[in-house]
């Protein structure tokens, strides 16, 4: 998938570069029709460049000095014509979107090797963000994480636990960063976020998504109701489109799948079967690469066993690290 993204973007860059160079040729034609001497100078400069290269190879210092002097005079004459007619010198240069890489996507590093231009890196990130189906990654990331919105009061009688919501969310954050840093390690489990609505489960999921996308991973987010409906539509639609085929492939093969709001879907046997297939395929690494899943839900693990098939509950209990979110609803606190 990462290679496909790069290939698609480089194709876009090639088109941009071609357009910039084609537009330059149009401007040159217009300008040379008005000022024929500019075209003559351009031709003489090209000839001088060829002769200069020949002179360097033949080792003739005098002829090289003469050619250098001639080139400087021609450039000076060209500059004077442009200034006299209020024409910017950039008018005869390609109008690339990125001046740094000239719309190639690559720049030279300190060595002879080429590296990705910052503009292409950003394009890859933007493309990956859009592909993830998460709309607010610019706001929901660890840079925006504020533990102070969580209460620091320890209330075991209320939450049945001897730490505060703030201590809890900080511990969860540390575990999630560990998950990111060890994403390729098959011994690291998937994640189940459980707790009431408005406690930061989706926010933390998006923070993880953001970091993994920056690391070049493919991420796909969807709520459980939409995910399961779409998968069933895909499977039983005789006239499905290529985009529907790609959707199912993405669900099974994306590096990180985020299933939000598990437990809010209307369940039936087909949805249970498809949910098991998705979870099991990704658990067994049947795609020949490491795939991880994050599930967020209002259900605790006991309710998951109760509401879903035994085989789904056992997969989650056995292969997911479970993190309990508790505290006051942050949606009201923010207001």
Predicted regions and their residues:
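Pre-Walker A (pre-P-loop) alpha-helix and adjacent loop at the N terminus of AAA/AAA+ ATPase modules
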Residues: 138-190
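Walker A/P-loop nucleotide-binding motif
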Residues: 188-204
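Short, charge/polar-rich alpha-helical segments
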Residues: 1-12, 16-42
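Conserved alpha-helical scaffold flanking the Walker A/P-loop in AAA+ ATPase domains
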Residues: 177-183, 230, 234-257, 273-284, ...
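Loop/turn-to-beta-strand initiation segments
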Residues: 189, 217-218, 253-256, 285-295
